[in-house]
A protein has these predicted regions:
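N-proximal helix/coil linker or "cap" segments that precede and/or mark the start of modular domains
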Residues: 1-20, 169-175
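Short acidic-hydrophobic, aromatic-tinged amphipathic segments that line or gate anion-handling sites
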Residues: 99-103
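Thiol-/selenol-based redox modules, centered on thioredoxin-like
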Residues: 121-176
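Structural microenvironment flanking redox-active thiols in thiol-disulfide oxidoreductases
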Residues: 56-94, 106-110, 173-176
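N-terminal "domain-start" segment that seeds a small globular fold
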Residues: 8-34, 155
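Short active-site neighborhood of thiol/selenol oxidoreductases, capturing the structured segment around
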Residues: 33-62
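Structural micro-motif
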Residues: 96-98, 114-126
Length: 176
């Protein structure tokens, strides 16, 4: 009799509830997904390592073209399993004007099923609706056009534009 290896890890899919998290950010704040979702949708862009080529290209895309996302009612984060200190240096070097989240325990990466080989995150981007449900998972991220692709996908998913009456964080979209 042959026995198969059973994996108890559940790969997240569109329609699943996004796992909550509470992670330290490069802007000095901690972000809890459930708190941010009270205000608007969330884009969580996992990246393998701060300072590596593809990750630098992706971060620069978001830093240089983030204006494409500012009018859409969504908060976006990059996230990795790097220590916060590494992500802070990485954010400063790339002029990131958005939060980079650190998951040094790797628990959130495991919850999102992005932990590869047990030590780095896969480059996957999760689009999460205000109701906490995963709307889309991009498992083929193009670092060079990350900002443009995010903006297009958010619009395609029907995420509304920001309005003064509905945006509670218009002056600083990343303050909590």
């Amino acid at each position: 009799i042959l026995f198969g290896i059973v994996s108890y890890s559940h790969a997240l899919e569109v329609g699943d509830k996004a796992p909550d998290f509470n992670l330290q950010s490069t802007d000095g704040n901690k972000y809890q997904l459930s708190d941010v979702l009270e205000k608007e949708a969330v884009v969580l862009a996992w990246f393998p390592f701060a300072g590596t080529k593809g990750c630098t290209i992706e971060c620069k895309s978001l830093a240089q073209n983030g204006h494409l996302l500012k009018d859409i009612a969504a908060t976006y984060f990059m996230a990795s399993v790097d220590p916060i200190e590494d992500n802070q240096v990485f954010a400063e070097e790339n002029n990131a004007d958005f939060p980079l989240l650190s998951d040094p325990t790797k628990q959130t990466a495991k919850d999102y099923d992005v932990l590869s080989l047990g030590w780095y995150a896969k480059r996957h981007t999760f689009y999460i609706g205000k109701n906490g449900v995963i709307l889309y998972i991009d498992r083929d991220v193009r670092p060079e056009t990350s900002a443009e692709d995010m903006a297009k996908k958010l619009i395609d998913l029907g995420i509304p534009k920001r309005t003064e009456s509905s945006d509670l964080r218009m002056a600083n979209p990343y303050s909590s």
